[in-house]
C-alpha cells in the first residue's frame, strides 16, 4: 500500500446497540464492531494513505495504521484509488446447475397482481416433450456438478402434469447412465392438486411451494379464478394432507391492501406450512404505499427478534426471507450479480 494511494470506503451504515457501535458494509454484507479509531478513519474518505497515517498517529503507529487499512481492504470495506464495482467484477464461465422449465404458459386463475399476463406471458401454450428434453440435455452437457436441479414453473405447471412426469422419468434415465442426481421443485397455485398428483410429488421428492396470501378475506381479494371466485377454500382443502405432513411451503404476496406481514405469517403458520417466504407485488405499490409496507416489514423484523428471544426457534425458522438475510451477513461476501441467471441457472 503506497503513501500516495487514495482510500475510498464502500457504502456502509453505522448503528449502536447497548452502547456498542457496529458497521454494516453493504457491498460485502459484512457486520463489524468498530471503535473510535475506525470511526475517525471513516471520516477520511478520499484521503491518501500518508494523510491517514498522520491523522491517526495519536491512536496508532504507522505500521498499525497500514495493518488496519489492509484488514479493511481484505474485508471489502474499502478500496484504493476509487476502483469501480464494474472494474472489480470478474466474468465467470457459466457452469449450470439448475434449470427452470415453464411447463405451461397458461393459468386457471387470474390474480390481480400477476406479472405474466394471466400466466401466458403474451405467448400462450404448453411446453412440448422435445423442448423439455433438449433443455435437460443442455443442462447436463454444460454442468460439471453431480447434483442438478429442475424447477417446474408456469403459468400453472400442473396444467401440463403429464410432461412433468415424463421429465422426471427422463432424468431418472440420465441418472442411471451418468451417475448425476436430480432434485426438483414446483411452484403452483395448488388448486389442481389431486390425490394422484400429491402421491407422485411426494414419492419423487418434488418440493412443493404454493401461493397463498394469508387469511381467506385477504387472499381472495387478489387470488381468484377467471369467474372472480376466491381460491382460498380450494387451496386449503387441496393441500391439507401435504401440510399435515410438513411437505409444502406457502409463498405469500404483500400488496397495499394486504401488508400486515405478522398477520400473514401467523395465519399461514397456523395452517402448518413448513416455510413461509413473503414478497412484495412491486407492480402494485407506489412510493407512499411502499413507506407503509416498509413500516409493516420493520414490525415483522421485530417480531422475528421476539421469537428468537423467547426461544421459539422452529417458528422463527419459517421466516425464510429473514433467515436468508442473516445468513448473507454471517457468511458475508461480495455479490456482483443479483441471481445466477446465465451463470448457474437458465430457463
Predicted ranges, named:
Residues 27, 117-120, 152-154, 216, ...:
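Short, histidine-centered active-site or binding-site loop motifs used for metal coordination
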Residues 159-276:
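Conserved AdoMet/S-adenosylmethionine-binding subsite of the radical SAM
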Residues 1-43:
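Acidic, low-complexity/disordered tracts enriched in E/D and polar residues
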Residues 41, 51-79:
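Basic amphipathic alpha-helical segments that dock to polyanions
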Residues 4-12, 332-345:
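Structured beta-strand/loop patches that form or line metal/cofactor-binding pockets in enzymes
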Residues 222-233, 240, 244-340:
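Radical SAM enzyme [4Fe-4S]-AdoMet core and its adjacent flexible, acidic
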Residues 67, 71, 75-77, 81-199, ...:
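Conserved alpha-helical substructure of the radical SAM core
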Residues 109-113, 216-220, 286-288:
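Short acidic/His/Gly/Ser-rich catalytic and metal-binding motifs that mark active-site loops
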